[in-house]
A protein has these predicted regions:
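Bacterial Sec-dependent N-terminal signal peptides
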Residues: 1-16
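Cell-envelope and extracellular/periplasmic
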Residues: 14-472
């Protein structure tokens, strides 16, 4: 009898409405929208969803596989804790301490993954103080998706919402946290972050199989690691992160995407911009929320001065902005100390997160007075042995008149030499080199590691550039 009762109790537990991890206590729902919820019950079962902020109850039917989907209308953002009650005939699940605010989906590789606690021998600047005081940010919540490479798309991934405090925050993505902190401070609303990232991944890892199968440089039989279990090195494979980490979250109602990736695509710059666009187009389509904003980070300087492979990747990232509507890139060219030259994980993530936040605040939330775009090359004019450069996003000038570093000039022989650069007028730069009498091309910070020192008046750095289209 005891065995039978136990079995019946267990059966009832299994039958109760089932939710994915992303719907948990402490979650943040996007404000003033129809927020999407889903889960599982018995096939054909009626499922009800009730909220503490409304007297309305939404009733939906589970499909033949037990999957159900519902939407609830959310109010304006508030720090007041809310509850959701989701029930079927066998029981109910109550989600507590739910906040209504702004939700952003963050993805990429290790520099997005990198937590406030840092990686081995790779610290985050100021982390101890940030972690110690993190409980004061009661409106910041983060769900960190566990790494999960899968050969085929799955319905579930692990990773529940956590409140911000010294116990939880060391595992929060540093870049995403600093983004959330800035947005929370300016808008004074709760901010939820879904961190779905995995160090070392290529852009192809976040795309589905049918898309990647069309790429001539990828052989799925060769490139997908099929051995079980799906271990840490599966980041090397295409499609696996899309299948196991991103696909289960598609449809969670968000405000936009943040992306920090590219180091693993160095050497593949000719295909990167288009593939990034393909990824963004696909994500937007599958989320079904229209042209969601997509703000992304230029990879930071790393490696040897002599190399240029990562410089070409940065150039591809900058070009991607013109391909992807409602997108913008933030530069990080000024954020790496000399001793970090061969460290792909620089310590300054506060500036990265803040620059992403400037983009969102200025362009998504329409906050006036915030500079968001880094100055960038527009055109050149050769006058004898001198080149006059013009720029966009530099209407108010630059941070220095002389002592500009990182410029090079080449003639028809394509040999580059360090050049002297000075401000002309308010927002043009004059470049000259005594070794090049007939200049053909100018480059700025166009090496694997070659930080420049030019920025606009708000401290946003000049994006690395070249005026030529040579292969190297």
């Amino acid at each position: 009898m005891a065995v039978c009762l136990c079995a019946l109790a267990q059966s009832a537990t299994w039958a109760k409405v089932d939710l994915p991890d992303i719907f948990s206590d402490n979650m943040v729902l996007q404000q003033q929208t129809d927020a999407r919820l889903w889960g599982w019950s018995e096939p054909g079962a009626k499922v009800t969803v009730g909220t503490s902020w409304s007297g309305n109850v939404v009733t939906v039917d589970a499909d033949k596989n037990g999957k159900w989907t519902a939407t609830v209308e959310t109010p304006a953002a508030s720090y007041a804790p809310q509850t959701l009650t989701i029930a079927d005939k066998d029981g109910q699940v109550k989600l507590s301490n739910v906040l209504i605010g702004e939700v952003w989906f963050c993805s990429g590789q290790s520099n997005m993954e990198m937590p406030l606690a840092g990686f081995d021998n790779c610290p985050i600047a100021g982390a101890n103080e940030v972690i110690a005081t993190s409980a004061q940010y009661k409106g910041i919540r983060m769900a960190t998706v566990e790494k999960n490479g899968q050969l085929s798309p799955v319905d579930r991934c692990q990773g529940k919402w956590k409140v911000c405090n010294p116990e939880n925050s060391p595992r929060f993505s540093a870049t995403a946290f600093f983004f959330a902190r800035m947005v929370n401070s300016v808008l004074d609303v709760p901010v939820g972050i879904i961190n779905c990232s995995w160090g070392g991944t290529m852009v192809e890892g976040w795309l589905p199989r049918d898309t990647v199968a069309k790429y001539p440089d990828i052989d799925l039989k060769r490139d997908i690691r099929k051995e079980e279990p799906h271990d840490w090195w599966h980041y090397l494979s295409p499609t696996l992160m899309y299948n196991g980490m991103l696909r289960p979250l598609e449809g969670y109602t968000i405000k936009g995407f943040l992306w920090y990736q590219g180091e693993s695509n160095v050497g593949k710059h000719k295909t990167y911009a288009q593939r990034l666009k393909t990824m963004v187009d696909l994500w937007r389509k599958e989320w079904g929320q229209g042209e969601l904003p997509f703000y992304f980070v230029e990879i930071a300087p790393f490696g040897k001065y002599e190399g240029r492979a990562s410089a070409f990747l940065r150039e591809a990232q900058y070009k991607a902005q013109s391909l992807i509507a409602n997108s913008a890139m933030v530069s990080t060219n000024d954020l790496v100390e000399p001793y970090e030259a061969e460290n792909v994980h620089p310590k300054d993530k506060r500036s990265v997160g803040s620059r992403l936040a400037y983009q969102a605040l200025a362009k998504t939330y329409n906050i006036k007075g915030i500079e968001a775009d880094c100055p960038a090359y527009k055109s050149m004019e050769v006058k004898g042995d001198t080149v006059v450069l013009s720029f966009v996003h530099a209407d108010n000038g630059f941070n220095r008149m002389k002592g500009m570093e990182g410029f090079e000039v080449a003639g028809a022989d394509r040999e580059f030499y360090p050049a002297k650069a000075e401000l002309m007028g308010k927002n043009q730069i004059v470049v000259v080199c005594d070794k090049v009498s007939s200049p053909v091309s100018v480059r700025y910070a166009f090496h694997d590691y070659s930080p420049g020192n030019v920025a606009n008046l708000r401290g946003l750095p000049l994006v690395p550039f070249r005026t030529d289209d040579w292969d190297w």
